[in-house]
Amino acid sequence: MKLIIATRKSQLALWQSEHVAQILKNTHQIEVLLEGFKTKGDVLLDSPLAKIGGKGLFTKELEESMLRKEAHLAVHSLKDVPSFFPRGLVLAAVSKREQSNDAMLSQNYKDFLSLPKGAKIGTTSLRRKMQLLLLRPDLEIISLRGNVNSRIEKLKNNDFDAIILAMAGIKRLNLDKQVNFVYEFSKDELIPAASQGALGIESINDEKILELLKCLNDENALIETSIEREFIATLEGGCQVPIGINAELLGDEICVRAVLGLPDGSEILKDKRMIKKNDFKGFGESLAKEFIAKGAKELLKKAESMI
């Protein structure tokens, strides 16, 4: 049997797809091929993600290729995957999670506190912008899109004092070797995006394919990301609004951190809970409902009007 993986052509996307392909080859001794596609999010680089549609920007073309039967599966950064799937496609697996926190890369400043007043920080994420301004209202947050290499080049050219990336991507591509300083934010400083660091394997809804993909599943990653995705789905939030949610398994307990608010950090709702591992089902939804009772929907509408 031969499996075809639909993939974006960026360096990180190719790494992720090749990583999954290798596991499938080693486990089942089958042929696995990669088929590259450009998504809307890869082409429209001049506008912030929030203004051109948020989630689905990096998945739609890959999903269409599967629906046309040109590919059997696609490997995504799970944080880019919408909560609901087109008919005929399913979330087949969530693989073992890489570090889920964010990090600051800089050529001249070793940590966040050493940044000078008014420092220029590159990130396109409204979630990061909100939390960075909450910590340091003096910073100038500038939209930064494009592939990872172009972002690093802009940092080296002194267009920015620092840029913010996910630690997962930094580790997968060894980006720490390309810059002078990497400062890892704690999850209390910067609450990550839902499913950050996890790979989501989307596939056609076919029993034989789903059976082959079972080997990619990681139980801990499934538990953590199910809480996070449930929270986002209940709030009906996506990339276009500033929401952070992270569930972290610590033995038989789970630490859940959540935040949402306005992009400028002037108004936020934030919470941190410890729950028993056995109580994870439905917790994302119940936490979201608590946020809604505190005015989360109104705050997110206000956030959308500010974009």
Curated annotation (Swiss-Prot):
Its cofactor is dipyrromethane. The porphobilinogen subunits are added to the dipyrromethane group. One of its GO terms (cellular component) is cytoplasm. It is an enzyme of class 2 (transferase). One of its GO terms (biological process) is protoporphyrinogen IX biosynthetic process. It comes from the Bacteria. One of its GO terms (molecular function) is hydroxymethylbilane synthase activity. HAMAP family: Porphobil_deam. It comes from Campylobacter jejuni subsp. jejuni serotype O:6 (strain 81116 / NCTC 11828). The keyword Transferase applies. Keywords: Porphyrin biosynthesis, Transferase. Belongs to the HMBS family. The keyword Cell membrane does not apply. Pathway: Porphyrin-containing compound metabolism; protoporphyrin-IX biosynthesis; coproporphyrinogen-III from 5-aminolevulinate: step 2/4. PANTHER family: PORPHOBILINOGEN DEAMINASE. This is Porphobilinogen deaminase.
